Amino acid sequence: MENRWQVMIVWQVDRMRIRTWKSLVKHHMYVSKKASRWFYRHHYDSPHPKISSEVHIPLGEARLVVKTYWGLHTGERDWHLGQGVSIEWRKRRYSTQVDPGLADQLIHMYYFDCFSEAAIRKAILGHIVSHRCEYQAGHSKVGSLQYLALTALIAPKKIKPPLPSVRKLTEDRWNKPQKTKGHKGAIQ
């Protein structure tokens, strides 16, 4: 019988970013209680030796599973050190991988209060409107001019510590393009 390979997307992440993610998740699960329905699985509870942790985030009937890995093949840079993250959406027997932006939007829809574009309509109808968004990472696009005007009137309150963003966890802060020097040291 032949070997059958299964390929999955694993985002290379440095270990300090993974530590920050884990501590933010635990803080909002146990201290602030904003993520009290989330489930954190430690490395010693996982049957796979490369999984360092799993966070199960219920989304209605489905759930989002964010797995962190260690001991993977090292990346191009020394600081990658074989750490990684995979993000999976599961519903019953079906599962698929999602990108960090979509994961943040899904988390935002289910868990955190938001002052969204629907707030304009609610305010006109005289309904009570949430005056700020607790989870800015869940917004991937620029809002309408009305939305931007209303958000300019109400300054967003900084939440300490910040809410755990999957996009921020997988962000590549090391490989930003560098400015090169051209003729006689002038930056191009």
Swiss-Prot record:
Motif BC-box-like motif at which residues?
144-153
Q: What induces it?
A: Expressed late during infection in a Rev-dependent manner.
Entry membrane topology: Peripheral membrane protein
> Which residue intervals make up region (Membrane association)?
171-172
Q: Per the record, which residues fall in region RNA-binding?
A: 75-114
Name the InterPro entries on file: Vif (IPR000475)
Site residues by UniProt (Cleavage in virion (by viral protease)): L150, T151
Instruction: Give the Phosphoserine positions (modified residues).
Output: S144, S165
Where, by residue number, does Zn(2+) bind? H108, C114, C133, H139
Transmembrane parts of this sequence: none
Record PTM? Processed in virion by the viral protease. Highly phosphorylated on serine and threonine residues.
Localization per record: Host cytoplasm; Host cell membrane; Virion
- Kindly state which keywords UniProt assigns to this record, in alphabetical order: AIDS, Host cell membrane, Host cytoplasm, Host membrane, Host-virus interaction, Membrane, Metal-binding, Phosphoprotein, RNA-binding, Ubl conjugation, Ubl conjugation pathway, Virion, Zinc
Which residue ranges does the record annotate as region Interaction with host APOBEC3F?
14-17, 74-79
Where composition is biased (Basic residues), the residues are 176-188
Cellular component, GO annotation: host cell cytoplasm; host cell plasma membrane; membrane; virion component
Give any single GO term for biological process: viral life cycle
- Region Interaction with host APOBEC3F and APOBEC3G: which residues? 54-72
Q: What else is known?
A: Vif-defective viruses show catastrophic failure in reverse transcription due to APOBEC-induced mutations that initiate a DNA base repair pathway and compromise the structural integrity of the ssDNA. In the absence of Vif, the virion is morphologically abnormal.
Quaternary context: Homomultimer; in vitro and presumably in vivo. Interacts with viral RNA and Pr55Gag precursor; these interactions mediate Vif incorporation into the virion. Interacts with the viral reverse transcriptase. Forms cullin-5-RING E3 ubiquitin-protein ligase complex (ECS complex) by interacting with host CUL5, RBX2, elongin BC complex (ELOB and ELOC) and CBFB/CBF-beta. Within the ECS complex, Vif interacts directly with host CUL5, ELOC and APOBEC (APOBEC3F and APOBEC3G) substrates.
Q: Which family does it belong to?
A: Belongs to the primate lentivirus group Vif protein family.
- This protein is called what? Virion infectivity factor
The organism encoding this protein is Human immunodeficiency virus type 1 group M subtype D (isolate Z6) (HIV-1)
- What does the organism's lineage look like at the top? Viruses, Riboviria, Pararnavirae, Artverviricota, Revtraviricetes
